[in-house]
Amino acid sequence: MLSGCVSPPGLENDIFFEQADISKDEAPHVANSLEWWYATGWLKDVETGDTFGIEFVMFHFSMNGKKDRLLSNVAITDVSSDKFYFDHTLIGLNDQLKSELPLQLSTARGKSQASIKGQFGEYEFVAKGHHEGEEFSYTLNTVSNSPAVLHGNKSGYENYGGYAKAGYYSYTDLATEGQIMVDGKLRTVKGSIWYDRQWNCGAVLQNRTTGWDWMSISLKESNEKLMLYRLRLREGLNIYGGTLVREDGTYSSLKSEEISIRDKSYWKSKRSGDRYPSKLEISIPNHRLELSLSMLKEEQELAIKILPLVKLYYWEGMCAVSGTRDGEPVTGTSYLEITNPENREK
């Protein structure tokens, strides 16, 4: 999402290892160029069955290696009411974040608040925001249904086409309970959250990347998970990658040449004027996967004001999945993120 920053953070304090260590890497990294704790989920009202999507992200970055910043983005998609709510808060810290667990990260400005507490799959996500005059909020608690997935051939460091590397692991199925408030109504909800932890991400922005498409996919019939991405480079090329998590919990990385992601239709935002792919076709022949991913609701674009005259737009929201696995029909759910959508192969 921060790929549109005018001045990307410096990389001098990013430290890489051969293997990620979740017991340490869950915590903030001192003076990191860019890192985040990211949650997206599908939830249902326990009484009515109404479906909601949530996004929570806490960015941490250091522009000069001395003072840090935190940026939170929060959102709710109300499927039954066809509404989308989002808010963000950017704050500067007086010092550097310390590498401490459990996590206790928070932002607050005016009436907008966001916080994450916890560690290793057990979290509390709290958000309170205002969107176009309407208040929304949630408090969600999670426990993990499965171990963490270490991307990048199980090293916990994803290699983006050989020119950039970043730490990356996920909890792909966090059992979630809590409350959501939209339209003045407090709802009790349950469901599943996908949690991403990434660090040392400044290198991805500093090089040739102009934008990316990232998606998490949960397949119902085969009980499998997929993380996929398409990085778009300045020279007009794409880099693909991802991880396939099988029903038994084993997982393997997907190489760029194994993956095809094609735009099939588009939606143009009236707010930003940007055109986003509204339907994607995904093919992974080596694993006999053929999937179609479609926006569940087109109006899931977020606007983030980084500087007084700089506003960044990106799309992130719920998508429906259909297709085949080993020749058998499958359906599923997804969250898709699209940044800098106009910088893509034609």
Where are these regions (language model features)?
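Bacterial N-terminal signal peptides
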Residues: 1-3
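Structured soluble/peripheral alpha/beta segments that form catalytic or ligand/cofactor-binding pockets
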Residues: 6-346
